[in-house]
């Protein structure tokens, strides 16, 4: 029996409850329960926050269920931020995280961004390995509630003074 195919597609309004459930479920799995106010707000305002030509949000759908997410939105200038790369536990290690990341990076390049930035908790060690494999460089390790690491990847050669 061949495994069920996974389709990556743009977020639709009807996806919001399933996306919220997936993201908050992954956060709870990694021990983040109380401090998710900003995440909940981002999820509630997702259709607005990821709208327009400079942003996007995608879901991975398998058998009618949402099993992964990823987003990109403007940060400043030609830098965008990779957001909400989350996978259901059953999909980790299948290559789906890489597929979602590649989808997001392709969008960032086509939208004219030169740098991709992200902030991710050190609890997500497996995801950090994916970022490093894909050319992200650690900028800073924060001593905040989320134990965040900040990463950046240069997408295209930047000419002239920095």
Give residue ranges: language-model regions:
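Conserved beta-strand-loop-alpha-helix junction that forms the acyl-donor binding cleft
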Residues: 89-92, 117-127, 144-148
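Acetyl-CoA-dependent GNAT
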Residues: 6, 10-83, 88-90, 101-103, ...
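Conserved active-site tyrosine of GNAT-family acetyltransferases
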Residues: 131, 136
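Conserved GNAT acetyl-CoA-binding A-motif
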Residues: 108-120
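Conserved G/P- and acidic residue-centered "switch" motifs that form tight phosphate/ATP-binding loops
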Residues: 64, 95-97, 112
């Amino acid at each position: 029996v061949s495994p069920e195919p996974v389709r990556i597609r743009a977020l639709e309004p009807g996806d919001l409850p399933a996306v919220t459930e997936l993201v908050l479920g992954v956060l709870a799995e990694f021990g983040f329960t109380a401090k998710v106010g900003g995440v909940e707000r981002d999820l509630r305002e997702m259709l607005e926050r990821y709208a327009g030509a400079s942003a996007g949000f995608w879901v991975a759908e398998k058998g009618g269920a949402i099993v992964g997410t990823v987003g990109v939105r403007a940060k400043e200038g030609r830098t965008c931020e990779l957001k909400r790369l989350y996978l259901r536990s059953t999909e980790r290690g299948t290559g789906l995280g890489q597929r979602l990341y590649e989808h997001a990076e392709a969008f960032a390049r086509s939208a004219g961004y030169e740098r991709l930035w992200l902030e991710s908790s050190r609890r997500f060690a497996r995801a950090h390995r994916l970022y490093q494999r894909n050319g992200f460089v650690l900028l800073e390790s924060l001593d905040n509630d989320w134990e965040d690491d900040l990463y950046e990847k240069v997408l295209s050669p930047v000419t002239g003074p920095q």
